[in-house]
UniProtKB/Swiss-Prot annotation:
Coiled-coil annotated spans: none
The reaction(s) this protein catalyses: (2-aminoethyl)phosphonate + pyruvate = phosphonoacetaldehyde + L-alanine
Modification type N6-(pyridoxal phosphate)lysine: residues: 204
Organism annotation: Aeromonas hydrophila subsp. hydrophila (strain ATCC 7966 / DSM 30187 / BCRC 13018 / CCUG 14551 / JCM 1027 / KCTC 2358 / NCIMB 9240 / NCTC 8049)
Transmembrane segments: none
Gene3D superfamilies named among the record's database cross-references: Aspartate Aminotransferase, domain 1, Type I PLP-dependent aspartate aminotransferase-like (Major domain)
Protein name: 2-aminoethylphosphonate--pyruvate transaminase
Keyword Membrane attached: no
Keywords: Aminotransferase, Pyridoxal phosphate, Pyruvate, Transferase
């Protein structure tokens, strides 16, 4: 007899998180079929169109022939580690911009991989400044690559990609962008910005489900990764070559159901009006959220000019009876799931604005939020 408990009863929670996030019924339904990992109907009929569409979304028409997309099993962090471990040669040096948990994670990866690198630690609630980055580049002329998180979901900060990209282009530095929580929800033109590698994940702004991440990169940069990998399964060049030469085939077992869901999510992104339209919806969600939370007495962690439309951190109430776990459970009982804080310097919690979320659903959250504030005398 099995000792695995029965699955909990299905509840249609609204996940107000940075991913995994709430998906549409049609994205989930796309997973209700099985695929053979070596069959042409799957690889050439599903994987290859995904690769082409990712390049189309990432670069303007005049740049698209310069770029290619590589899909890789695992979470987004697996793909970040694949890029760092494959793209930085033994005689090259990486500068990591660290202003949150995900910049710090890249530093941890670099140390584990034995990469020559430097870190610019800006603090969790400070935006990186191009002048400070340039000073670091002047001080360390051995730096060849720069890696930065675009949307640092530790705080919800949108880092200054345009300014940093312009600096890298001017100084001949190869730019690696962790766009995990921004690609698909914020317009980015890799060609215009001169980005070498852009990394994201299926379960973020494209609104798919977890299971793989992807890299969009210059073909020349991918070719230069040959022989550099510090890992077999995370060898970016080998994965790219297999997909290029065998019509979308993955080297190792492909997460077929996740890929089918992602293909449907890409279709739904197009139906919504593309990245610009999705960006407007996310921005409207975030504005509705911040205005409504202010009316309830909650203040955002970041100034408005630094805030992304992806996720927002709010200071926790100073009331002695407030406990995040109790607050969370009261919201969950009403069908809403939020995120705990990740900032070491402030007591806060986070609410995501992405996924199958609209301003109307945010307003429903705000009603639930008012009744979940149990430390206020009239909360029910």
């Amino acid at each position: 007899m099995t000792h695995i408990p029965a699955a909990p009863a299905a509840v249609d929670y609204l996940l107000l998180t940075p991913g995994p996030l709430s998906t549409t019924a049609t994205v989930r339904a796309a997973m209700l079929q099985d695929s053979c990992t070596w069959d042409a109907d799957y690889n050439q009929g599903v994987v290859e169109p995904i690769r082409r569409e990712l390049v189309r979304l990432a670069a303007g028409p005049e740049y698209q022939s310069d770029y290619s997309a590589v899909l890789l099993q695992g979470s987004g962090s697996y793909v970040v580690e694949s890029v760092l471990g494959s793209a930085i040669g033994v005689d090259e040096c990486l500068l990591i911009i660290n202003n949150g948990a995900y910049g710090a994670r890249m530093g941890e990866m670099a140390r584990c991989l034995g990469l020559r690198h430097h870190e610019l630690d800006c603090g969790e609630t400070t935006r990186p400044e191009a002048a400070a980055i340039e000073a670091m580049l002047v001080r360390h002329p051995e730096i060849t690559h720069l890696a930065m998180v675009h949307c640092e979901t530790t705080t919800g900060m949108l880092n200054p990609l345009e300014e940093v990209a312009a600096l890298c282009q001017r100084r001949g530095i190869r730019l690696i962008v962790d766009a995990m929580s921004s690609f698909g929800g914020i317009p980015i033109d890799m060609g215009r910005l001169g980005i070498e590698f852009l990394i994201s994940s299926a379960n973020k702004c494209i609104q798919g489900v977890p299971g793989f991440g992807f890299v969009i990169a210059r073909r020349a940069a991918l070719a230069a990764c040959a022989g550099c990998a510090r890992s077999v399964s995370l060898d970016l060049h080998a994965q790219w070559q297999t997909m290029e030469q065998q019509g979308g085939k993955w080297r190792f077992t492909s997460p077929t159901h996740t890929v089918l869901a992602f293909a449907q999510a890409l279709r739904e992104l197009d139906e919504e009006g593309g990245i610009a339209a999705r960006h407007r919806r996310y921005r409207d969600n975030q504005r509705t959220l911040v205005d409504g939370m202010a009316a309830l007495g909650f203040a955002p962690l970041l100034p408005e000019q630094w805030q992304s439309p992806i996720i927002t951190a709010f200071y926790s109430p100073a009331h002695p009876d407030y406990r995040f776990a109790d607050f969370y459970q009261r919201l969950k009982a009403q069908g809403f799931v939020i995120y705990p804080g990740k900032v070491s310097q402030a007591d806060c919690f986070r609410i995501g604005n992405i996924g199958d979320v609209t301003p109307a659903r945010v307003r429903c959250l705000l009603v639930a939020m008012a009744s979940a504030c149990y430390w206020q005398g009239d909360a029910r």
